[in-house]
Curated annotation (Swiss-Prot):
Keywords: Cytoplasm, Nucleus, Phosphoprotein, Proteasome
Full protein name: Proteasome subunit alpha type-5
Gene name for this UniProt entry: PUP2
Localization, UniProt: Cytoplasm; Nucleus
Location of Phosphoserine modifications: 56, 251
Function, as annotated: The proteasome degrades poly-ubiquitinated proteins in the cytoplasm and in the nucleus. It is essential for the regulated turnover of proteins and for the removal of misfolded proteins. The proteasome is a multicatalytic proteinase complex that is characterized by its ability to cleave peptides with Arg, Phe, Tyr, Leu, and Glu adjacent to the leaving group at neutral or slightly basic pH. It has an ATP-dependent proteolytic activity.
Oligomeric and partner information: The 26S proteasome consists of a 20S proteasome core and two 19S regulatory subunits. The 20S proteasome core is composed of 28 subunits that are arranged in four stacked rings, resulting in a barrel-shaped structure. The two end rings are each formed by seven alpha subunits, and the two central rings are each formed by seven beta subunits. The catalytic chamber with the active sites is on the inside of the barrel.
Length: 260
């Protein structure tokens, strides 16, 4: 006798007769409510950009942390439940440090992503010999970007289901559908790092409800020379200004209307 739909909903490790895990599907839906995050990989580096939503005018935008460093050569952007992201990021940092201590080398990007996705599967009752870590799947997705000697610049999308894929360009969050369509049109293999920075800002501007500025958007990049770095507000403001000038040069009529 089959269980009811509500009973399958509550069972995080029980498949429905259709072969579905509803709690995992719900966790994927939670990500669609999160702020938009975009990653673009180029031959010069990887760029990450996120929308910083302020739920109150009294909220300090600097306290909204959507892009974080995992190691000197790896960083990530998140969309979904920030509290869940903290657990995944701490696990990733521990994995990176442990690998460095044991092997005296930096962990490669794919191995670290695999470690994070292994953690994402540790929910429910737990397998034999494994500790149950969580009562439900994580409600967050990560864009993990980095550089290593084996595979160069890489961008991975890690889901709450434990699935991960490598992308040249990827968008997650509430504006991901429109952003991904724009990435399909705009991305090409010869993109420079500067072009990728401006493309991320351009797409964020299109999908965000608020006017784009240095307080509600954040950028970071990873290069072989400088490692991972998050741009400060001044650097972000300069890039936004450069984007506006570029758009004005391409379509002066629209720029005149916007200025008026």
């Amino acid at each position: 006798m089959f269980l009811t739909r509500s009973e399958y909903d509550r069972g995080v490790s029980t498949f429905s007769p259709e072969g579905r895990l509803f709690q995992v599907e719900y966790s994927l839906e939670a990500i669609k409510l999160g702020s938009t995050a975009i990653g673009i990989a180029t031959k010069e580096g990887v760029v990450l950009g996120v929308e910083k939503r302020a739920t109150s005018p009294l909220l300090e935008s600097d306290s909204i942390e959507k892009i974080v460093e995992i190691d000197r050569h790896i960083g990530c952007a998140m969309s979904g439940l920030t509290a869940d992201a903290r657990s995944m990021i701490e696990h990733a940092r521990t994995a990176a440090v442990t690998h460095n201590l044991y092997y005296d080398e930096d962990i490669n990007v794919e191995s670290l992503t695999q470690s994070v996705c292994d953690l994402a599967l540790r929910f429910g009752e737990g397998a034999s010999g494994e500790e149950r870590l969580m009562s439900r799947p994580f409600g967050v997705a990560l864009l993990i970007a980095g550089h290593d000697a084996d595979d160069g610049y890489q961008l991975f999308h890690a889901e709450p289901s434990g699935t991960f894929y490598r992308y040249n360009a990827k968008a997650i969050g509430s504006g991901s559908e429109g952003a991904q369509a724009e990435l399909l049109n705009e991305w090409h293999s010869s993109l420079t790092l500067k072009e990728a920075e401006l493309l991320v800002l351009k797409i964020l501007k299109q999908v965000m409800e608020e006017k784009l500025d240095e307080n509600n958007a954040q950028l970071s990049c990873i290069t072989k020379q400088d490692g991972f770095k998050i741009y400060d507000n001044e650097k972000t403001a300069e890039l936004i200004k450069e984007l506006k000038e570029k758009e004005a040069a391409e379509s002066p009529e629209e720029a005149d209307v916007e200025m008026s």
